[in-house]
Regions:
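N-terminal (or domain-start) structured segment
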Residues: 29-126, 165, 190-213, 305, ...
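Hinge/capping helix and adjacent helix->loop/strand transition within the periplasmic-binding protein
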Residues: 95-101, 115-202, 250, 255, ...
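Stable alpha-helical elements in mature extracytoplasmic
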Residues: 56, 60, 64, 89, ...
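A ligand-binding cleft/hinge motif common to bilobed small-molecule-binding domains
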Residues: 110-119, 183-187, 213-247, 323
Length: 334
């Protein structure tokens, strides 16, 4: 089956999403001291988190906010505004004063929602400016221990011999794991039935109970079950193997395949570039600290710390990629 992405587009996506990382941010970023941003911030700062408290993304938000608070000598308040697949919180950021005192955290829904939801109260590109992609969240495919396959190649072969027989669960329709599964189906040329759940836990329950064949989920969410022998790790979805683990990637069977959940900071589009650069530079400095990197990696993430321009480009490339997957798979928001 013809891949959804030409090889050139894939290389651009991989470049935007991983290779830039920490090594090149300083050269590409505008000066943080330009335009009088050196005394930023002069007042308390609000970090909008568009999902409920708890989980790895919230942990990273709080870790970074505490470090920025120390650097800036101003409170950095984490304000939770969940709902509508993150659209409520993102809209709050889009409509906030463009003074740098309000910025927000986003995940992959930021790039998916323009295609998944019929109407958004903001324009993802026109109303919001990327500050930095903080990290990628590692994703994985797991199976029941008694599944008749143990590798991705065996899974694909089994699925082709038994079309429509396999079922897989995800934390919800339109989630990055769901989109990754649909992309895998199309690139590998097989079919399986999707069962969306309200979060990871019920999907795990169904797999453990033998009522599902597979689950696509964040790596750390399923790792304890794999270690206990209650689930079988088939593959991870990132470009490279998860550091410290020997589990194979999908890309080792399907070169160029790469899906992970992004985590980043955005600001109102009219925020002065020097202020955006200041937030980016200080966030990147925080992420360069060995202890912070270790704690982010403990949440199942790979540190990226891209520049504002790199993050904007990556979001737009992800919007293009997922728009096509959503249209071809007929995916709708729950």
């Amino acid at each position: 089956m013809k891949p959804l992405l030409p090889s050139q587009d894939r290389r651009l996506l991989l470049l935007a999403g991983s290779g830039l990382a920490l090594s090149g941010f300083a050269a590409a970023a505008p000066s943080a001291s330009a335009g009088g941003a050196g005394d930023y911030p002069k007042a308390p700062v609000k970090l909008i988190v568009p999902f409920a408290p708890g989980g790895p993304t919230d942990t990273v938000a709080r870790l970074i906010s505490l470090k920025l608070q120390e650097m800036w000598g101003q409170p950095v308040l984490v304000d939770y505004k969940p709902g509508a697949g993150t659209a409520i919180g993102v809209d709050f950021v889009a409509k906030a004063p463009a003074d740098g005192l309000t910025f927000g955290m986003v995940n992959s829904s930021f790039a998916v929602n323009p295609s998944l939801r019929k109407s958004l109260p903001y324009d993802t590109v026109k109303d919001l400016a990327g500050i930095t992609q903080i990290a990628n969240l590692q994703l994985a495919i797991v199976a029941r221990p008694d599944a008749p396959f143990s590798t991705l190649a065996e899974l694909i072969a089994y699925a082709k011999r038994n079309p429509g027989k396999l079922s897989y669960g995800t934390p919800g329709a339109g989630s990055t794991t769901h989109l990754g599964a649909e992309l895998l189906k199309r690139e590998a040329g097989f079919d399986m039935l999707h069962a969306p759940f309200k979060g990871s836990a019920p999907a795990h329950t169904e797999l453990l109970g033998g009522r599902l064949d597979l689950v696509f989920d964040p790596f750390l969410s399923v790792l304890p079950y794999v270690k206990a022998g209650r689930m079988k790790m088939i593959a991870t979805l990132g470009e490279k193997r998860v550091p410290g683990y020997g589990y194979p990637t999908v890309a080792e069977i399907l070169p160029g395949f790469h899906v992970s959940a992004l985590l980043g900071f955005v600001a109102p589009r009219a925020t002065p570039p020097a202020v955006v650069a200041k937030i980016h530079a200080d966030t990147a400095k925080v992420l360069r600290e060995p202890e912070m990197r270790r704690r982010v990696e403990e949440q199942g993430m790979e540190v990226v710390a891209s520049t504002p321009a790199q993050f904007d480009a990556f979001v737009q490339s992800e919007m293009k990629r997922w728009s096509r997957v959503i249209a071809e798979a007929g995916i709708q928001a729950e």
